[in-house]
Structures are given as C-alpha cells and as structure tokens.
Amino acid sequence: MINSLCGSSNSLKEKCLQPNSSNQTNTHSKKNATNSCGDLEQINVLTPQSLNLPSLKFDLDGDVEVQSPDSSMWEAFFNDHLDNDFMISSPIRNINPNSPQASTYNNCNYNYAQGMQIQSLSGCSPPRFASQIGSLNSNNQQKGKGLSPLHRVFNSPNNQYMQHVENLSLPAIEEFLEDFQGDVDHFSSTKVSSECFDMETPISTILDSLTMQNSSSYGASVNEESTLLHGGNSSSQISQESDIYHQMGSMASASLSQALQQERYQEKHQKMQAQQQSLTVPIQIGIEQEQDSGLQLVHLLLACAEAVAKGEYMLARRYLHQLNRVVTPLGDSMQRVASCFTESLSARLAATLTTKSSSTKKLAPSSLSSSSSSSCLSTFPSNPMEVLKIYQIVYQACPYIKFAHFTANQAIFEAFEAEERVHVIDLDILQGYQWPAFMQALAARPGGAPFLRITGVGPCIESVRETGRCLTELAHSLRIPFEFHPVGEQLEDLKPHMFNRRVGEALAVNTVNRLHRVPGNHLGNLLSMIRDQAPNIVTLVEQEASHNGPYFLGRFLEALHYYSAIFDSLDATFPVESAPRAKVEQYIFAPEIRNIVACEGEERIERHERLEKWRKIMEGKGFKGVPLSPNAVTQSRILLGLYSCDGYRLTEDKGCLLLGWQDRAIIAASAWRC
C-alpha cells in the first residue's frame, strides 16, 4: 500500500532534510525508568541528518505544483487550500502513562514505549502505511464524528449486500435507472463535458440533487415531489400540473405571460414555506435522507460492477454515465469513495473493451499495463520530496503506520531480551524509518546495547545502501555496535545465503505490509526459507481485508466496504475542505482502489488477506503464534490517546492486535516463531 510507493522517492538528499542545530550538539546518555517524557525527548535529537525529517507540521513548498492528470479541478482546489488547513487534527495530547514496574525488564519496556511516544510527536519515524476489516469490540462509544452515509449504509439493518458477497441479489436496478433518467429535467441545465467527472456542476448542486428525492424544498410536500421525480409517467405529471392550475383559479383564463408570472410567484412562495418548515424538521430526517442517497450510490456501484462482471458492457456504461453525474472527489466521504470506485470501474471497462475478443472476458495484462496500471502510477507527483510529504500527512494524521511499527518493534525488543548479538532482517527497508525508535530502546537497555546487525531488503540496491548509511550514522551517535547489510532483490528472488546468517545471533524477521504483494506461487517458498533460518521472532503486519478472492464482484464489495471506513477516518481527522486530505486520497488510496478493481493477473498486486487467512498460511509453514504482550497493548492505547478522534478501535484476537475505525478493522499485527 503506502510503503510500496514510498520507496519510489529513493534516497533523500541531506540538504532536503536539514536538522535543527541542537541535533548536532547533543550526545547520548543512558535513561532509566524514572526519566520523564521531557528527559526522554533528548534521545530523539540524536537522529542523523538523513533520518531527521522536517517538523511534522510543515508547510508544503509554495512552488511545488501537484496536478493529477485525471481532472483539472485538482489544480485549482490545491492552490486555494494548500496553506490553509494542514494537519488540523494531528496528535497534540500530552499523555502521562502509568509508572514503570520495578523490574529492569519492565523498566526497559516502559522506557521504550516512552521513547516511541516521543518519536511519534517528533516526526523522525517512517512513511510506510498499511491499509485494511472485521468487527471490533470496544467499550468505548463513539464521541466524535458519526459514520459517513456510505459506511452507515453498510451498517444498516436493511442492508442486504453484505449477506451474500459472491451471490448478490440486487434490487430492481432497471427501475432504479429509469428513476435516475427521470431526472433529466433537473440536469438539463448542467453542461455535460468529456471530463473525467462528466459534468461541470457545482458541488452544492450535486449534493442537493442526491437528496432531492426526500427533500421538501422544491415545492408542495415530500410525497408530491417524490411523485414528480420518480413517477416517470406523463399522465401523473399532467394531473399534478392541472391541480396546480386549478389551485391558482384565474390562471386558466389569463394570458400566457400572466400565467407564467403567477406560476413563478407560486413556486417562490412554496419554496419559502418549505424553507421555513425545514427549520423544524428533526435532524434524524436529514440523516435518513443522507443515508438514502448513500444507498442509491451503493445500488448504482454494485449494479455497475455486476454488469461489468457479467460482460454486459453497454449496461455498465449506462450506470457509469449516471454515476459520473452524481459523484465528486470533493464531496463528503460517501461521494469521494464512490468517485474513486467509479473511476476504477471506468478503467476496468475501458481496458476490457480495448482488448476483449468475442470469447474473452478477462483483462489482458498487456492492456492493463498501458491503461489502468499506468494510470495508477501517473497520479503520483514526480518530486520525491513531495511524495514523502504526502506520506508524512498520513503518518501524522492517522495512527495506522505508527501502530504497525511500534507493535512490531515491541515484539522484537522483547524477543531480544538479554541477547548480546542481534540480527534484524527487514523485508522492506525503504528509508529505514521504523528503526530509530528501536535503536534508541536498545541503547537504553541496562548493561548497554547489544551488537546490532540489520539486513535491509529492497528492489533498488542504491536506495538500500543509502538507508544503511543513515542508520549507521544514527547507531554511531547512540554508541551502538552496528552493521548494515544491503540486499537489492525482490522477495520472490531471495536466497538463503543473502541473509549472511551467523552463529550466535538472535534473529528477527520483520515484514510490514509486504507479504501480500508476493505472488502466490512464491509465497510458500519464501516462508519456508525464513523458517529454515530459525528466527527467534517473525513480525507480520498486514491489511485486514480480503481483496484476493476469486470473484471480481466479491472483491469489489469488500473493497467498497473497506475503503469507506478509511475515508470515514480521514473525514474525522481533516477539515471539510482539506487539500492535504484530498492529496492523500487521490495519490495513495485511489491508486490502490484502481489496482484492486481495474487490474487482473500479474498487474493486480494489492492482494490483501484477512488475519485468519494469514494464520492458516503461517501455521501451514510450521510457524506458531506468539501472543503480543500487555506492554504492546498498553503502548497501542497510549498511541491512540494522542489522537483527538474517538473513532479508532483496538481489539485483541487470539494474541494478535487489530486497529480499526468504528466497527471495521483496518490493520492487523501478529508475531510468530518456529
């Protein structure tokens, strides 16, 4: 997910990441369990220049222009908002954790948790992210923002779509489509263009049109307007027009100009009455209208996906035409996520029609590489620093990345207790941002730090070497005996000798949001090779989602439910019209959605699996689960306490930890041994 594309920034030049002058003058001193958070902050300033990221609350460069080739509206939107509302809900709370226990071991864990808490506020940790499902139980009730309309649709007791994932029994979609086509009069004043969103309608107009079905602001009563919009039959409309003329009395015999004047006056009067009445309407009615419009979007999306799956391409194009008229990437979370899925369905349909023969319904990999896949890659800024800043937005605003790194680090730290020589194999090292907090914790261990060796794996050997140089500088400043070994290979091409295993070393293998990208025919061999290395601990963090099913329609529904939760959490974190949030959605999550929906075969690399599936895979290869410790749970709760949003939920599942938003898990962390 995020970490897969963050590596595209390669190594960052030191001149781009200048540290504070105080960073150069501080030296390391050992910390005991009685240190306060203020004392522990001194540890973090030891980060070398290459790893010391700018302040988390940075301002994006004014001369950097980020433009998506998919729609020209992004340029104007970003220019208007870029400097206004960045990171408004970033973690700012001061947490006073419980006092450390008396034992030196627990003191180390306490010290470690404190160090990582401070690091989460200082910004020297990584831009690597995992996206992700499942019910979460929590005694915490939601205190902040409620569910978005789309997420509320999925949680509605009337929702029938989650009951049959692969065998969907859709409602009368044809009738529903006719209802939409009955709104032509409303959209006739809208100029339709060939842009990506197929219209030039203001966002407020689109939002009004979605709720028009249950709105009373356009005259008479709710029932009368519903009849006008959805009756579709000319006789009922003529009858209602006759009633209007009958109520006006003298209009029938008046001249045409007088009739028009009277009609306009009556419409204005009815609108004023409706607006006055709307002030007394309970809030629940607005929620129901919002939910109903969300249900309409879900119906259209699922109907379009079903048409694509069945090869009914003309019908699919009709649905896409309707969707493009009512979705927008700048609306509420429901409309924004629907916009991403609409664009993805369009990409899949276009690629299919381009390469489809009369008997083939499956996408050809060659067509995808020139259409949907290239589209995913082309949306990212070419400036590596701009890409890094976008990932920093996610890293600070949401706890998902911190949770992944801190939970994995805690498990490795505990597995290395009392070891004098330790070796960590990171299967996706990137810029190495996971390891500064871990190295600080080792440096604070009673009796001194052990000898640490890190083997970093990545596709670009030069980038991995640069990461090793940065980590070596940090280890030197912390006075940790350190060695870095770079490996520039894809995971499926790894060989045992590349790990350079040594006798007497305690070994940990770390994989954060990486194994789901390994092709299925290579995953078993990779896990067997890791097992043969006899590691003390294997940390596995992955998205809690099932995007690798055999049926397109099931994957589509799962992704729609999953990413609606992601967009909901972003909605609760950022302001309503937030340029940083729009960047995160367009440059990170939209490409993921396109890959899941539009790609097939080797081009589909986002093959997320649920925790239960990973359990079967790991146990099938001879691994046994290691329950995450209470320290890891406490640490995660401290982390969530740093965020102002109350929608995040933490739950335990057979020794594993899952972090989610509301009732949907997003990311799952587990630990394993041979």
UniProtKB/Swiss-Prot annotation:
Protein's cellular compartments: Nucleus; Cytoplasm
Annotated region (SAW), positions in chain: 598-673
GO biological processes: arbuscular mycorrhizal association; detection of phosphate ion; regulation of DNA-templated transcription; regulation of transcription by RNA polymerase II; response to nutrient; response to symbiotic fungus
GO cellular component, one term: nucleus
Region (Leucine repeat I (LRI)): 295-372
UniProt motif (VHIID) ranges: 422-426
Keywords linked to the UniProt accession: Cytoplasm, Nucleus, Transcription, Transcription regulation
Motif (LxCxE motif): 302-306
A GO molecular-function descriptor: DNA-binding transcription factor activity
Region of interest called PFYRE, as start-end residue ranges on this chain: 507-595
Subunit-level organization: Forms homodimer in nucleus and cytoplasm. Interacts with NSP2, RAD1 and TF80.
Protein family according to the UniProt entry: Belongs to the GRAS family.
UniProt-recorded name of the protein: GRAS family protein RAM1
Organism: Medicago truncatula (Barrel medic)
Gene assigned in the entry: RAM1
